[in-house]
Design a protein with these regions (language model features):
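Bacterial N-terminal signal peptides that target proteins for export
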Residues: 1-10
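Bacterial N-terminal signal peptides
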Residues: 9-18
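Acidic, histidine-bearing metal-coordination/catalytic regions of metal-dependent phosphoesterases
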Residues: 25-189, 212-213, 476-477, 482-523
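Extended active-site neighborhood of metal-dependent phosphoesterases/phosphodiesterases
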Residues: 144, 152-174, 233-364, 383-408, ...
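Loop/turn elements at helix/coil->beta-strand transitions in domains of secreted/extracellular proteins
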Residues: 183-186, 214-221, 252-258, 315-320, ...
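Conserved, compact domain cores that house catalytic/ligand-binding motifs in diverse enzymes
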Residues: 185-260, 265
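Active-site neighborhood of phospho(di)ester-bond hydrolases with catalytic His/Asp-centered motifs
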Residues: 189-191, 219-224, 257-263, 369-373, ...
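Short acidic, glycine-rich surface-loop motifs adjacent to enzyme active sites
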Residues: 222-229, 363-381
Length: 523
């Protein structure tokens, strides 16, 4: 993703006095001051006593049980996956539109800096942001506005840590603004990176390097990323968030990130207080906020404001929809004879369902893609399953004994979620949670289980049957899903990740082990 060094020299061969000249592109970029106070409040409460350069807290001591989405036993981020290098900063891109993008920088030093940027095809047209002072572990939210649609931009982060210190310049990074209808593009998907005892940081970086090689316009991560619910206290997981910024920052300086919540990410209302996790996620990871480009949740919540938990947008010929089944599920699962309602308590909630219905019914996109950590309800108490789970609960409308009680439990809703997706031409539902690759088909919809990007072993698929997967193409982790969208057809590939020690004549890193196509909706 890094462009030739000769282009970097255009940005960085400047004098010290020129680092912070009068801003000539004031109207084309701004620092998002409105969200900055919330971001500053979202730092780790233990940060003052535990801060290190690079922000990591080492070790993996664990006491007690792990347990579901509730509070678990971690006291520190598990080693070795969370033992990431120190660094002066990391950068994540988010919220790309036809005319803007958000750059979220997390510095680990004090100083002052600026973003310089220009269209790829006219590198001499350099603009820059206002000078920005920064403090260690206080996120910077920089929004570049007034950009050209359907354009690749290059940018660099230039900074000083003292007035007499040399100017530091990042590598040259890039991003692309919204593609128009008819243009081809690539995006990628991963899920369940975990960074727990079964995770390998080496494999994860290998996967992310493979993602970068695909040169996607953006990347979606389908949750179980921060594992907040596995810690004794939510704030103990802060180092986990920083580790993910290190890993995802290895590519997301040039690949905008969209995050979809998972059951372990600390924002399941039924599992207790979500305030710390929501504020921390919002401070460190810039998800879409509803505006003229993005549709989404417009109901503010407590001290957080916009939740940025479900959202939709258009890119080229495709509609993208990200869903959240955790914020509005307010009851915990009951087991055995106390579980009188099955999994009907799992829900998108009225507002999210009505929003989903409207987004689907008003879209004329050729492709419609839905992203969710697991199906709403699933097939069992742990919400496992693909198409075998699709007939049940809010997703499919039936109890596990086959009786249809949808209108009993959802009297204000038109139809179950799966039927809504079928009638509105959704081609693929991307879901995670179950930790392997599975491509299944049901009534014209592909249910694509997304593999882990970071599993520590070259795995097997024995858990597929245990989790209720009885059909389809099933393969083990690790790897990522690559989607190449064009107006005529969309190709979906499973790109495998192998460390050198695991490669042989039959498997090489970045091999494509399975591919299929989906066709556009006919008008």
């Amino acid at each position: 993703m890094i462009l030739p060094s000769i282009r970097t020299l255009v940005f960085c061969s400047i004098t010290f006095a020129a680092l912070f000249p009068p801003v000539t592109a004031q109207d084309a970029s701004r620092q998002d001051d409105q969200s900055a106070p919330q971001e500053r409040q979202a730092q780790d409460p233990q940060q003052q006593s535990q801060r290190q350069t690079g922000g990591q807290r080492r070790g993996g001591q664990r006491k007690g049980g792990g347990g579901g989405s509730g509070l678990g036993g971690y006291e520190k981020p598990p080693s070795p996956a969370n033992d990431v290098p120190n660094r002066p900063y990391d950068i994540l891109l988010g919220r790309p539109t036809d005319s803007a993008i958000t750059i979220r920088i997390l510095p680990f030093e004090k100083g002052q800096g600026t973003i310089r940027y220009a269209p790829f095809n006219t590198p001499q047209s350099i603009q820059q942001t206002k000078p920005i002072e920064f403090q260690p572990q206080v996120p910077l939210n920089i929004e570049l506005i007034g950009l050209q649609a359907n354009t690749r931009y290059n940018y660099v982060w230039e900074y000083q840590t003292a007035t007499d210190a040399p100017i530091q310049c990042s590598s040259e990074f890039s991003f692309h603004t919204q593609r128009p209808t008819g243009d081809s593009f690539t995006f990628t998907v991963t899920s369940d990176s975990h960074l727990d005892e079964n995770s390998s940081g080496e494999v994860y970086l290998r996967t992310l390097a493979n993602v970068a090689a695909d040169q996607p316009d953006f990347h979606l991560e389908l949750g179980d990323t921060f594992m907040t619910g596995k810690y004794k206290k939510p704030e103990f997981s802060y180092g986990h968030y920083l580790s993910q910024r290190y890993y995802l920052g290895s590519i997301c300086h040039s690949v905008p990130l969209y995050f979809v919540l998972g059951n372990h990410d600390g924002e399941s209302v039924a599992r207790g207080d979500t305030l710390w996790a929501t504020r921390t996620r919002k401070a460190l990871f810039p998800n879409p906020t509803p505006n003229t480009f993005y549709s989404g949740n417009q109901e503010p919540w407590e001290e957080v404001g916009a939740l940025d938990n479900y959202y939709a947008w258009r890119w080229g010929d495709a509609l993208f929809i990200a869903l959240d089944p955790y914020r509005y599920t307010t009851e915990r699962p009951r087991r055995g004879e106390n579980n009188h309602q099955g999994n009907w308590f799992w829900t998108l909630g009225d507002s999210q369902y009505k929003w989903l219905e409207k987004v689907l019914e008003t879209s004329d996109a050729k492709y419609k893609f839905v992203f969710i950590h697991h199906l709403v309800g699933g097939a069992d108490q742990n919400n496992r399953g693909g198409i075998e789970a699709a007939p049940f609960w809010e997703w499919g409308g039936k109890n596990t004994n086959g009786t249809d009680e949808f209108h009993k439990y959802r009297p204000k809703w038109k139809q179950p979620i799966h039927r809504l997706l079928v009638e509105n031409g959704v081609q693929v539902v991307f879901h995670g949670h179950d930790h392997f690759f599975a491509k299944q088909d049901l009534e014209g919809i592909v249910y694509q289980e997304v593999p882990q990007p970071s599993h520590s072993r070259v795995g097997n698929t024995r858990t597929a049957a245990e989790y209720g997967y009885l059909s389809g193409e099933i393969q083990p982790s690790s790897g990522h899903i690559r989607i190449r969208v064009s107006s005529d057809a969309t190709r979906i590939d499973y790109v495998r990740s192998y460390l050198p020690k695991d490669e042989n004549n039959n498997r090489k890193n970045a091999d494509v082990s399975y591919s299929y196509h989906v066709t556009p909706l006919s008008k």
